[in-house]
């Protein structure tokens, strides 16, 4: 996510770079700026509250340094990872490149995924490594995130510890998932909760509701794949707002008036 709200993730596949241990990236130990980075990290760790923006900026600086100096062996590892992960990773990387090129632009204004993917593959075939550079930067990040999470899980299991995680019922409006499969969402609606004892005005969670008929027409492939991705990392999954599979408060995207909202 671009903010600190964990349920506003830009992907149901990729891992958040915020959790990357950049000290384990190849090239970190010999970096001239290592002491400066570690001094800044110490200051950030001493804060009473997490400064998400500053943490992201520092980690991005380290990642860029290490990626720009990655050797052939490291890049071969990244390419092998990208080959194994297929379209999930490619879609994520292309999305991130578009987001960097068009900051603040809603995904509904991006060119379609199939078009962008085809153009990228065609350009890559002609220009080779140069065309890959931006895309591989994000594959590099995910490669080491997956590697670190895998090692963490192995260590936990050796000590008889299980890993449990949340699966939010919704996905971010400006996400890879909405970009790749907009037909699975009602983009003119937003999910939330009706007025109650805790919130007199109700709640607007900001993410689009699902088109369950479109989901069913594809045998719920998107959902089955989402669970499969999470099962790679987790031993147990808590579905946040499981009632959302049966009914959810739907608010017109163009209106904050809860009187126009209803359960669907």
Model-identified regions with their sequence ranges:
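Walker B catalytic acidic pair
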Residues: 241
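Substrate-binding/active-site clefts of carbohydrate-active enzymes
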Residues: 154, 162-233, 247-264
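Acidic/aromatic-lined carbohydrate-recognition and catalytic surfaces
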Residues: 1-182, 215-216
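Divalent metal-binding pocket/active-site signature
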Residues: 244
């Amino acid at each position: 996510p671009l903010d600190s709200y964990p349920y506003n993730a830009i992907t149901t596949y990729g891992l958040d770079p915020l959790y990357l241990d950049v000290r384990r990236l190849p090239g970190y130990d010999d970096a001239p700026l290592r002491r400066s980075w570690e001094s800044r990290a110490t200051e950030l760790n001493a804060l009473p509250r997490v400064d998400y923006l500053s943490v992201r900026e520092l980690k991005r600086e380290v990642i860029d340094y290490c990626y720009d100096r990655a050797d052939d062996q490291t890049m071969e590892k990244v390419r092998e990872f990208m080959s194994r992960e297929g379209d999930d990773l490619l879609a994520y990387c292309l999305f991130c490149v578009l987001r960097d090129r068009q900051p603040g632009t809603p995904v509904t204004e991006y060119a379609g995924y199939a078009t962008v993917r085809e153009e990228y593959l065609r350009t890559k075939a002609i220009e080779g490594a140069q065309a890959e550079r931006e895309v591989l930067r994000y594959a590099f990040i995910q490669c080491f995130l997956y590697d670190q999470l895998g090692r963490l899980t192995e260590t936990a299991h050796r000590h008889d510890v299980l890993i449990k995680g949340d699966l939010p019922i919704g996905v971010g409006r400006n996400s890879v998932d909405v970009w790749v499969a907009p037909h699975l969402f009602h983009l003119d609606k937003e999910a939330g909760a009706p007025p109650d004892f805790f919130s007199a005005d109700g709640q607007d969670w900001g993410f689009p509701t699902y088109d369950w008929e479109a989901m069913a027409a594809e045998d719920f492939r998107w959902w089955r794949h989402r669970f499969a991705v999470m099962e790679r990392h987790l031993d147990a999954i808590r579905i946040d707002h499981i009632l959302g599979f049966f009914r959810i408060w739907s608010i017109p995207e163009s209106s904050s008036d809860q009187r126009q909202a209803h359960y669907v």
